[in-house]
Amino acid sequence: MKREGRKIAGVVVWDTATARVADRAGVDIVSVGDSVAMSLWGRPAEGDVSVDEMLLVCTAVARGVERALVSCDLPGGSLDGARRLVADGGAEMVKVSGEELVAAIARDGIPVLASLSGDGDAVTEARRLEAAGAAALDFRHSGEEDGRRVADAVSVPVIGGLGGGPWLDGRMRAVHRLLDDPLAAYVADVRAGRPVKGD
């Protein structure tokens, strides 16, 4: 998609029904985030989740997807965990941090969405992760200038969460963050006695 100049739209979801809605909407990547621990289960830390739990969530999400690519965060950082998410969970890509782990998983033939750490020089890190075999880069919480420099420095897509500017190759958002305005509009329509979608 980067070569074609088409931006990548991604959403983070944790269940079959939402995955189905995202897939029908034309999302390119449905990402199963380890944020499930905090956002869905109310745990105190975002990464407080096991491979077995991610496997369960990934399987549910994959059941709702017919077209989009399913990516899954890999807790624990093991090659065996990545293999399980692909073989048993329906993931087509895994998201990890760290050059060595990216290289090990990529050598095994599994596409990797590699997270930039945000420590040090982002361009150098991005080039190293691409050289290690990353199929795409996750660059969150970046400024616009850093986003442009990283996107220009590598041939793989650079997908941003918060920040990064229009130069990034795509965006990833947790689906619940996209619901604020539509949900508020729904409440306003109901209270005003107006028809709502689905009536």
PLM region descriptions:
Residues 1-199:
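Alpha/beta enzyme core
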